[in-house]
């Protein structure tokens, strides 16, 4: 039933599968689940290459607009590791929840990537280094220059230049066996890009682009975290929140089909179910094995199936 709820909309669930249950009944199944108390095991930052967090709007009871917030890790193999989802919960409380699960008590060389969401500037600063999403960074500059009175045709060259400066490509392969000249090439591009951004800030000030200068100045120290980490450790970390945005699209599509108007707890529960089923299938299957008391002491194998012919056809 739960997997059917996650995979389809209510009308198709009822009509296509002959399941006699009301939308309120589905809500009660979800809200009665203990999924919110599950998956609280410790997380090792050492296994991750990045952590991301963001929020998105959801429609709730009586037309009220709520906020669904999620935190995910990205493993070194590039897989999504769900860390938590929360509905109408303040970022400091979310941070406390995530910190309680993190095993390491000291800073680790991974970035925390975010798109500039208010309240996230120092999120998990004890264990990760802040990195602004490079895609959102350039997009935000366009809006700041628009506030300074620049139309798109005049601000586009500046945003294109920022994209070029922060788009440093890192060499693939084992960091330890890379040629020193390859490492020096990256370091040189990194240093020259930072210098050019400082020059651009100065130019903005001289031209009276106060919003653009202020935005770029606040952003400049948070755009190259992935490069700095690579130069120190050789770990190639993400630099955008694209994986998290893809997750929100998956959750949003399903919430609109089945969970519009639901309570905070129900939205939190169904979003956790979606995240875990989508990205942690082994944990999802183990959860239901434990719930159903399946110990795995034996296997059932169907060798063949014979269907007798029907006399009426």
Q: How should each PLM-predicted stretch be described?
A:
Residues 1-3, 249:
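Contiguous, well-ordered alpha-helical segments that form the cores/surfaces of helical PPI scaffolds
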Residues 3-12, 16-123, 219-227, 243-244:
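RNase H-like nuclease fold core
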Residues 24, 28, 118, 136-139, ...:
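Residues on a specific face of well-ordered alpha-helices
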Residues 59-62, 137, 260:
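A generic structural signal for short coil/turn motifs at secondary-structure boundaries
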Residues 65-68, 144-156:
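Short, surface-exposed amphipathic charged segments that create phosphate/polyanion-binding patches used
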Residues 103-131, 156-313:
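Acidic/histidine-rich catalytic cores and adjacent linkers
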Residues 127-149:
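Inter-helix linker motif
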């Amino acid at each position: 039933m739960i997997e059917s709820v996650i995979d389809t909309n209510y009308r198709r669930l009822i009509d296509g599968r002959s399941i006699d249950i009301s939308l309120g009944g589905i809500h009660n199944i979800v809200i009665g689940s203990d999924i919110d108390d599950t998956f609280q095991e410790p997380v090792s930052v050492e296994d991750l290459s990045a952590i991301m967090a963001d929020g998105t709007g959801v429609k709730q009871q009586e037309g009220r607009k709520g906020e669904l917030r999620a935190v995910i890790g990205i493993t070194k193999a590039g897989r999504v590791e769900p860390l938590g989802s929360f509905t109408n919960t303040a970022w400091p409380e979310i941070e406390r929840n995530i910190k309680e699960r993190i095993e390491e008590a000291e800073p680790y060389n991974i970035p925390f990537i975010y798109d500039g969401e208010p309240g996230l500037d120092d999120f998990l600063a004890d264990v990760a280094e802040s990195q602004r999403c490079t895609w959102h960074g350039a997009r935000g500059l366009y809006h700041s220059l628009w506030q300074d009175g620049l139309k798109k045709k005049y601000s586009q060259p500046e945003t294109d230049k920022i994209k070029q400066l922060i788009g440093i490509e890192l060499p693939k392969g084992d960091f330890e066996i890379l040629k020193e000249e390859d490492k020096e090439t990256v370091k040189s591009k990194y240093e020259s890009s930072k210098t050019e951004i400082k020059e651009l800030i100065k130019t903005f000030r001289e031209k009276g682009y106060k919003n653009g200068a202020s935005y770029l100045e606040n952003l400049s120290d948070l755009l190259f975290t992935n490069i700095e980490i690579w130069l120190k450790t050789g770990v190639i970390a993400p630099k955008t929140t694209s994986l998290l945005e893809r997750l929100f699209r998956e959750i949003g599509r399903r919430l609109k089909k089945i969970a519009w108007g639901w309570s905070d707890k129900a939205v939190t529960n169904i979003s956790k179910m979606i995240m875990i089923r989508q990205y942690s299938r082994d944990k999802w299957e183990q959860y239901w094995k434990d719930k159903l008391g399946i110990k795995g002491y034996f296997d059932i194998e169907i060798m063949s199936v014979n269907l007798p012919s029907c006399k009426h056809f």
